[in-house]
Regions:
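Ligand-binding loop in jelly-roll beta-barrel domains
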Residues: 89, 104-127
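Short, conserved beta-strand element in jelly-roll/cupin
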Residues: 55, 67-82
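Short histidine-centered beta-strand/loop micro-motifs
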Residues: 62-67, 84, 109-111, 133
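Mature N-terminal segment immediately following signal peptide/propeptide cleavage
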Residues: 42-64, 73
Length: 135
């Protein structure tokens, strides 16, 4: 009986690790990797919180886009340049933060020589796409 339980535990563990790995890999495109860490309803009706870890390889950029709500960025490592509509470009390093108002067009680029990462927290309208690309 103990052997069956151990086998079951091993299979479940392998499936979960495989699912996480596939999910993480599926979110990598053009040198930018995105892993959604959590998504929860909040006390404001029709809104939710989404948190993601985003990696940028050196020289990669995520072009103009916006979100259906506020974004708070915390730089985990590296140097990221943010261009926010109506403001001068700003370069943030590890430990620095940036607030982006709802619907504001912005872009991000890794301007350093190594990988850069950010923790992005969004308070957005539930049911709407998290990112809208702007041409």
């Amino acid at each position: 009986m103990k052997t069956k339980k151990n086998l079951f535990t091993a299979i479940v563990t392998i499936v979960l690790i495989g699912t996480y790995t596939i999910s993480a890999c599926a979110q990598t495109k053009n040198g930018i990797g995105r892993i959604e860490l959590q998504r929860h309803d909040i006390s404001t009706l029709g809104r939710e919180m989404v948190q993601a870890h985003i990696d940028f390889e050196p020289g990669t950029a995520f072009g103009n886009h916006n979100h259906p709500g506020e974004e708070i960025i915390y730089v985990l490592e590296g140097e990221l340049e943010y261009i926010v509509e109506g403001k001068s470009p700003v370069v943030l390093k590890k430990g620095e933060v940036l607030f982006i108002p709802a619907g504001t067009i912005h872009s991000a680029k890794n301007v350093g020589n190594s990988k850069a990462s950010e923790l992005a927290t969004y308070i957005v309208e539930k049911g709407k796409p998290l990112v809208q690309l702007i041409k």
